[in-house]
């Protein structure tokens, strides 16, 4: 009954949205014309073409600096040109480390040498290819260290507070942390701040392995050998090429010495599989880890430090490599010096069907549909710039260097930057500048969800309502007319535009029904994607529609559709949340002080007691 009522409400909302005539930034007469343009645009999109393009671009490894990366960039360039866009490649020269030595050994009390290898699978056609990057964390320090092993849960500040209460110090030791609950680079940074000499990060099966579902290739989740590669660059300091902070990494740019680059970590770091983690964790003795630290392996998790001794040796090639940014433009007819920018990266750790190519091919199909519109005589009022970035995975290299080289021009001309990355099956997800919330509400009301035949906006709101944890959250969702845009931190190519240049930004994707464990592994492949992520590529089309409508409306609006009332409301909400958090922290501190006082009273020796 509840499901029927929910679907009925969604159907009514979809009908209301279908009857929408007014569009922010457009007069009524031009709104009707814009809606017709969007219908023509939508008709030009093709799930079949998106799937074919995904298969072609993910056919081989294409990390930055590799022959595959150049080949992918050149294919994208030719596609843009074939669509009628004015396209070229901008090349930057950036630092990129690759491992030449990776050794992880348990030397006592038992001996074990980590495999550090993901095996090829018959069910995954590209998993056995050569030229795959090995499993590693970029921007780890060179280092050859041996020390006691300590389990630190997820390796976050709260976990080290727990260790301190237990009287356990990691200084001079090697820590092992679970992936998850934060960006991976936080884990070795916090470990170093607490005196650790090395950091191992592993994927626990409780998070994305057999505890979550069937493992690959039978199911979508991480098998025992899967490893998440990834950057651990300290991007809080600055993103992009570590040697050229603040300036574009052109061939002749002035560069720092590597020892002076503050975003490169100070200790060796290595990611491993749960197959390799199990012998290490089994060897730990000492204090039994708290219940909420226990994981999915069939062992009792201990913290150490004790008899378990680990040897970790990481040595890198620190090479200068080319980054190929593919830039394509459609010149505006009325305001050519106002730019609507759209971006997605093309580099991957290995084949990268999900991350990033599922977003890249959706963006390319948008460009194809815009090219078809150009053939009908349509021209955008503002200049549209499509950007296929290189080097996102190691640290937002391509987008950051482009933004640094063109910073003054972008600050003068860019009116919005619309980003995407990986894409999958499920619910609309949007983050960005809150002044664009109403703008995105109108767009998500105009795009129909492939599975439910209601708007993607209404399906998202229904999902939020069903999954809300408290009555307060449910009331807030029901009381808000549209959808909130999530605050953007970092982690994708919007970072330099939003946080360094102050350009209004959107970050768009679909997902939530495409869980799995392939992320940054050799199994992020076309075979995995077509089985478990978006088998019909219908959500690739949904992303093309959502981002494409945003591009079209921004490019053709008579007035740019910013609504700063949403920004004011969001800032006020954040201020309230900070105040409430401060009050809660004061209460918790007072309670902990009382508990400590009671503990001291109970444990203080009674000097008056007669024996």
Please report, for each region that a protein language model flagged, where it lies by residue.
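Hydrophobic h-region of N-terminal signal peptides that target proteins for export
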Residues: 10-17
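Noncatalytic luminal/extracellular "stalk/propeptide" segments of secretory-pathway proteins
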Residues: 20-32, 55-169, 174, 205, ...
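N-terminal capping segment at the start of a domain
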Residues: 28-67, 286-288, 421
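Structural recognition of the beta-strand scaffold that forms the well-ordered cores
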Residues: 53-56, 88-89, 149-152, 174-178, ...
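Soluble metallo-hydrolase cores and metallopeptidase-like ectodomains found primarily
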Residues: 127-162, 237-354, 368, 372-376
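A conserved hydrophobic secondary-structure block that centers on an alpha-helix together
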Residues: 152-221, 333, 337-339, 349, ...
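Alpha-helical metal-binding/catalytic segments enriched in His/Glu/Asp
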Residues: 205, 326, 342-396, 547
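Metal-dependent peptidase/peptidase-like ectodomains
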Residues: 224-288, 335, 390-530, 556, ...
């Amino acid at each position: 009954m509840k499901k029927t009522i929910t679907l009925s409400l969604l159907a009514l909302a979809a009908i209301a949205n279908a009857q929408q005539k007014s569009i922010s930034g457009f007069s009524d007469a031009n709104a009707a014309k814009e809606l017709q343009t969007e219908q023509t645009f939508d008709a030009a999109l093709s799930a079949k073409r998106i799937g074919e393009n995904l298969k072609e671009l993910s056919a081989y490894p294409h990390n930055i600096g590799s022959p595959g990366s150049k080949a992918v960039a050149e294919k994208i360039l030719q596609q843009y040109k074939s669509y009628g866009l004015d396209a070229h490649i901008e090349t930057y020269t950036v630092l990129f480390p690759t491992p030449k030595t990776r050794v992880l050994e348990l030397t006592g009390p038992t001996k074990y040498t980590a495999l550090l290898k993901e095996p090829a699978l018959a069910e995954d056609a590209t998993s056995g290819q050569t030229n795959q990057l090995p499993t590693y964390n970029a921007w780890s320090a060179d280092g050859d260290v041996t020390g006691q092993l300590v389990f630190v849960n997820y390796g976050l500040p709260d976990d080290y507070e727990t260790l301190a209460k237990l009287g356990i110090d990691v200084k001079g030791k090697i820590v092992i942390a679970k992936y998850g609950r934060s960006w991976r680079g936080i884990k070795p940074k916090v470990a170093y701040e607490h005196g650790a000499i090395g950091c191992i990060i592993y994927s626990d099966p409780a998070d994305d392995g057999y505890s979550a579902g069937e493992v690959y290739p039978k199911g979508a989740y991480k098998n025992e050998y899967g490893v998440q590669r990834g950057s651990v660059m300290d991007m809080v300091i600055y993103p992009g090429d570590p040697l050229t902070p603040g300036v574009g990494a052109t061939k002749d740019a002035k560069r720092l010495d590597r020892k002076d680059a503050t975003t490169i970590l100070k200790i060796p770091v290595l990611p491993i599989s749960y197959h390799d983690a199990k012998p290490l964790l089994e060897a730990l003795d000492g204090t039994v880890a708290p219940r909420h630290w226990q994981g999915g392996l069939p062992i009792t998790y201990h913290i150490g430090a004790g008899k378990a001794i680990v040897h970790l040796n990481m040595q890198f090639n620190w090479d200068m490599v080319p980054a190929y940014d593919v830039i394509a433009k459609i010149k505006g007819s009325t305001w050519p010096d106002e730019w609507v920018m759209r971006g997605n990266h093309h580099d991957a750790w290995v084949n990268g069907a999900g991350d990033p190519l599922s977003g890249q091919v959706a963006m390319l199909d948008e460009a194809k549909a815009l090219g078809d519109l150009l053939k009908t005589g349509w021209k955008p009022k503002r200049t549209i710039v499509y950007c296929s970035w290189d080097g996102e995975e190691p640290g937002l290299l391509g987008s950051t260097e482009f933004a640094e080289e063109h910073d003054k021009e972008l600050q003068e001309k860019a009116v919005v930057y619309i980003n995407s990355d990986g894409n999958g099956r499920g619910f609309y997800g949007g983050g960005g500048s809150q002044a664009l919330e109403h703008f995105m509400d109108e767009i998500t009301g105009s795009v129909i969800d492939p599975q439910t035949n209601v708007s993607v906006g209404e399906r998202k709101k229904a999902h939020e309502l069903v999954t809300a944890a408290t009555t307060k959250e449910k009331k807030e969702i029901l009381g808000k007319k549209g959808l909130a845009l999530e605050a953007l931190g970092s982690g994708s190519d919007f970072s330099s535009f939003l946080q360094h240049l102050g350009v209004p930004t959107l970050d768009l994707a679909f997902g939530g029904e495409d869980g799995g464990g392939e992320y940054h592994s050799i199994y992020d492949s076309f075979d995995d994607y077509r089985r478990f992520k978006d088998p019909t590529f219908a959500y690739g089309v949904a992303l093309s529609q959502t981002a494409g409508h945003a591009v079209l409306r921004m490019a053709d609006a008579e007035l740019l559709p910013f609504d700063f009332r949403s920004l004011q409301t969001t800032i006020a909400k954040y201020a309230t949340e900070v105040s409430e958090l401060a009050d809660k922290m004061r209460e918790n501190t007072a309670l902990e002080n009382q508990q400590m006082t009671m503990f001291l009273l109970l444990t203080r020796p009674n000097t008056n007691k007669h024996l």
